[in-house]
Regions:
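Alpha-helical interface subdomain recognition
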Residues: 2-4, 21, 28-177
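Long, acidic (Asp/Glu-rich), low-complexity accessory segments flanking structured domains
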Residues: 6-25
Length: 177
């Protein structure tokens, strides 16, 4: 299925780029949109980590706060690691974009990393929050909504399989940079 315009005239003031460059303009915009999704996922992951830490500080089990337990500390550190790496990747991709580089490869890599990040952080959050994390609204924030929303982000601007293909093509073309 395709879309074809025959004898369609578009005034110059409405044209987004040069004639014949429409696909390039669309693909460039798609890269920026993927970077935006990665940044949105970063924000969700950061919020989930904050909720996890707040709960772990307050919840007492067997005489001490969850935050004092090594297993919980491991989940918090793992979540923090993924968030830090994603934030660094997004900053690098944004720097490249501002330098005039094509953001498609890095944007796809950032979106892939953001999917992994929110998956890990949301699983850790639900484990730390326990049963209250499944309620629509718990006292620490919208855990259930964040969990659901981060899963929906997988599909926006292409699922992970599309991101892998796009990233691989770009990496192969540039030799890995």
């Amino acid at each position: 299925a395709g879309l074809r315009f025959t004898d369609c005239r578009v005034p110059d003031r409405y044209r987004l780029g040069e004639v014949g460059e429409g696909l390039h303009v669309a693909m460039y915009s798609l890269g920026l949109s993927r970077l935006h999704i990665a940044d949105s996922n970063l924000g969700m992951a950061q919020r989930m980590l904050e909720m996890s830490i707040a709960r772990a500080k307050e919840r007492i089990t067997f005489g001490k706060p969850l935050v004092k337990r090594q297993a919980i500390q491991t989940m918090i550190a793992e979540s923090g690691k993924w968030i830090y790496l994603l934030r660094s990747a997004i900053h690098d991709a944004a720097r490249r974009y501002e330098a005039g580089e094509d953001p498609m490869t890095q944007a796809s890599l950032c979106k892939l990393a953001s999917i992994d990040t929110v998956k890990i952080v949301s699983d850790n959050m639900l484990e730390i929050l326990g049963g209250i994390g499944y309620f629509e609204e718990c006292e620490y924030g919208p855990a259930e909504r964040l969990y659901r929303d981060c899963r929906a982000m997988w599909l926006e601007e292409g699922p992970p399989s599309v991101q892998r293909t796009t990233a691989a093509r770009g990496l192969i073309t540039t030799g890995g940079d």
